[in-house]
Amino acid sequence: MPNDRESRRVAQEVVVEAITTHTVWLHRASSAQVNRMVAEFDELAGELASKLAERLDNLAPAELAAFSRGRYTTDRLKGLRNLIDQWAESLATAVTAENAKSLEELAGYEAGFARSLVADAVTGAVAAAPAAAAVYESAMQQPVLGQMVEDMFEEVPRRTRSIVYSQIRQGISNGQTNQQIIRALRGTKALKYKDGALNWTRNEIDNLVRTSRGHVSNVAYENTYEALGVEEVVDVATIDFRVTKYCAGIDGRRHKVGTAHPRPPYHYRCRTVQAPSFGANIMGQRPYVKAFKPVSQIPKDQRPDDMIGQVSASTKWPQWFARQPASLQREWLGPTRYELYKKGGYKIERFSDPLGGELTIAELRARDRETFERLFAEAS
């Protein structure tokens, strides 16, 4: 590892610039994986909708009433139940198989990236990265947000199956036509199926794919850092207004490798990563985005000149935020938290709990009633 001040400075600069650029690639790669899995789900949902429409049309009114009460008393009702159950099993196979393959490939790539990251920052020989299979197995044996990755994905088909049953039963009870039931379940093509009950599954696939990939990446980094003798890591959050208050508050926090400490992902869709620290202040440049949604969703003619730029990599998120216009600060914090921040002396990290959850206004008031009474009594 670097052993003089200038070498540490250069090493830290190389590392932070490389890892912040890499996280952009990771987000795009995750988007591609989400798109593949959602497209596969949409195909399965289309097949289900077609078969359901045919089956429902063949049911007598008495059979529809029985289905709504959870009774499968005829061959046609049993056939409908089997159709839904088998479809849910097909969904489970598709989701778990596709994601497992993707995560194992990612594990190997990320371990290689972490090794290259350290190798480019230091002089001398660097050990080989852990094998992809070993990293993947390690990630599967570690919880992410308190759950195992496999369990998180197994819940998707179970919940989706429940949604299908519930939507059909509710539709029958409400007197909807079969066509209306199918439309409410799947949604409409004109709205890209976002108006259907099954949009929950599409969103959950998005959430879990991004979260599980973030988990595998960070396990790959940690295993590789430890194998290479890195002693300390630092949390590196994304500098934009999409970041959560928890990640904004812990940007720059350091941890000893090989000890029990908090690890990303800190929440669903978390973009924070842990970079190797060489005992020096973080140097170089890191990008920022003054936006509350992805840049790709903002028309070019609506992007201010200073919306995208760079700051010193040693700048922590709260320091960057303190220099932003009051209008942006208020929008990100909300009016009450903004007053606490500007006049109550609150730091960003005070708006979240130790587990990463954002504290509600009521919880903040209960914790610091004196400040609330002073600030908001003055305002009234």
Report the location of each language-model feature:
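Acidic, glycine-rich two-metal-ion catalytic cores of nucleic acid-processing enzymes
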Residues: I182-L185, L191-K290
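N-terminal leader/targeting and assembly helices and adjacent pre-domain segments
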Residues: M1-L191, Q285-S380
